[in-house]
């Protein structure tokens, strides 16, 4: 390969990376606007696990803050769960290198989970509850007004199917929620972002990823089964994931079976109901989004290239 070829290839990689970054910025910005996730004067506590999703969340929020029409603070928080072999130095070194306020919370949730959960059983449920309580407490201590989590579009769809298959509910992850005691607001700014985009972005940025030895590496999890099912659908039927996500944004209560959402009992002959679709059970295919948008860089490799960011953060 000649020097000219190398230069052209580098330019192409850089162009595609910048395009990927802009798409993530746009998706996060749209989610923030659609659900009023961040407001003037907010102090946003970004929960940083050391995985690709939370790194990307922090990076994009820092980028967006530079040109945001409102002022808000960001503080990164990591929960050190005292897992054996956990590289405690990685996150502090990274956060110091980019100049972000941060707090490392040390709690031996690993020991609690191992004590309470029999060997071979899934630890996710207990681990999640313990983490949630600690993060809520930490947000109060820091004076944070919003807690930002790194769940993305694929996580939301996986949760939808998990609840349908195993819980008997049509329920997903909300992009924004209020805690049971009403004291905390949790936001998911990556709600519109695809996991494939996040993975490519994290690889391109060379984030120092820390694997989870509690839950992420456990085999045969129900979530992993659902994830593989969705990935297979995505390969076989391009656009299906986009259509499914569109579906949870377009709910028609009159065409489901939940009597709490729609008053079926009082329907009478001759009634004319506004904004009710009547006997139309299946929308015409041409009205359903069937293909992803702006994905012509889908197969690009951004690993070994000098990057030019839209906004470089130091």
Curated annotation (Swiss-Prot):
Other noteworthy facts: The thiolation reaction likely consists of two steps: a first activation step by ATP to form an adenylated intermediate of the target base of tRNA, and a second nucleophilic substitution step of the sulfur (S) atom supplied by the hydrosulfide attached to the Fe-S cluster.
MF GO annotations: 4 iron, 4 sulfur cluster binding; ATP binding; magnesium ion binding; sulfurtransferase activity; tRNA binding
Gene Ontology biological-process annotations: tRNA thio-modification
Family, similarity comment: Belongs to the TtcA family.
This protein's name: tRNA-cytidine(32) 2-sulfurtransferase
Subcellular locations according to the entry: Cytoplasm
Source organism of this protein record: Pasteurella multocida (strain Pm70)
Gene field: ttcA
Binding-site residues, [4Fe-4S] cluster: 124, 127, 215
Record has Transmembrane helix as a keyword: no
Pathway(s) where this gene product acts: tRNA modification
Motif (PP-loop motif): 49-54
Oligomeric and partner information: Homodimer.
Top-rank lineage group of the source organism: Bacteria
Cofactor(s) this protein cannot do without: Mg(2+); [4Fe-4S] cluster
Catalytic reactions on record: cytidine(32) in tRNA + S-sulfanyl-L-cysteinyl-[cysteine desulfurase] + AH2 + ATP = 2-thiocytidine(32) in tRNA + L-cysteinyl-[cysteine desulfurase] + A + AMP + diphosphate + H(+)
Leading EC class: transferase
Pfam families recorded: ATP_bind_3
GO CC entries: cytoplasm
Keywords, sorted A to Z: 4Fe-4S, ATP-binding, Cytoplasm, Iron, Iron-sulfur, Magnesium, Metal-binding, Nucleotide-binding, RNA-binding, Transferase, tRNA processing, tRNA-binding
EC numbers: 2.8.1.-
Task performed by this protein: Catalyzes the ATP-dependent 2-thiolation of cytidine in position 32 of tRNA, to form 2-thiocytidine (s(2)C32). The sulfur atoms are provided by the cysteine/cysteine desulfurase (IscS) system.
InterPro entries xref list: Rossmann-like_a/b/a_fold, TilS/TtcA_N, tRNA_Cyd_32_2_STrfase, tRNA_thiolation_TtcA_Ctu1
Phylogenetic placement of the source organism: Bacteria, Pseudomonadati, Pseudomonadota, Gammaproteobacteria, Pasteurellales
Cofactor-binding details, from the entry: Binds 1 [4Fe-4S] cluster per subunit. The cluster is chelated by three Cys residues, the fourth Fe has a free coordination site that may bind a sulfur atom transferred from the persulfide of IscS.
């Amino acid at each position: 390969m000649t020097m000219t070829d190398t230069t052209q290839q580098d330019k192409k990689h850089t162009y595609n990376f910048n395009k990927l970054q802009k798409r993530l910025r746009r998706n996060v910005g749209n989610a923030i606007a659609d659900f009023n996730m961040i407001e003037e004067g907010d102090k946003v506590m970004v929960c940083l696990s050391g995985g690709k999703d939370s790194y990307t969340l922090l990076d994009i929020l820092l980028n967006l803050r530079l040109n945001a029409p409102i002022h808000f603070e960001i503080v990164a928080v990591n929960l050190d769960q005292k897992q054996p072999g956990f590289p405690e130095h990685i996150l502090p070194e990274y956060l110091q290198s980019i100049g972000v306020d941060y707090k490392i919370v040390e709690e031996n949730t690993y020991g609690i989970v191992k004590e309470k959960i029999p060997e071979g059983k899934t630890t996710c449920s207990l681990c999640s509850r313990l983490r949630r309580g600690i993060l809520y407490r930490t947000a109060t201590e820091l004076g944070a007004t919003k807690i930002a989590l790194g769940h993305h579009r694929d996580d939301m769809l996986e949760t939808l199917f998990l609840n349908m298959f195993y819980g008997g509910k049509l329920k997903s992850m909300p992009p924004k929620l209020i805690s049971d005691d009403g004291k905390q607001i949790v936001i998911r700014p990556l709600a519109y972002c695809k996991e494939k985009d996040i993975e490519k972005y994290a690889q391109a940025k060379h984030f120092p990823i820390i694997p989870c030895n509690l839950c992420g590496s456990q085999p045969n999890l129900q979530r992993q089964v659902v994830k593989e099912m969705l990935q297979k659908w995505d390969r076989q039927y391009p656009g299906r994931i986009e259509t499914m996500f569109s579906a949870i944004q377009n709910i028609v209560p009159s065409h489901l079976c939940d009597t709490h959402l729609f008053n079926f009992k009082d329907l009478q002959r001759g009634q004319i109901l506004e904004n009710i679709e009547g006997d139309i059970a299946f929308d015409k295919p041409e009205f359903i989004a069937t293909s992803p948008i702006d994905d012509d860089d889908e197969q690009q490799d951004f690993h070994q290239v000098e990057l030019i960011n839209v906004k470089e953060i130091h």
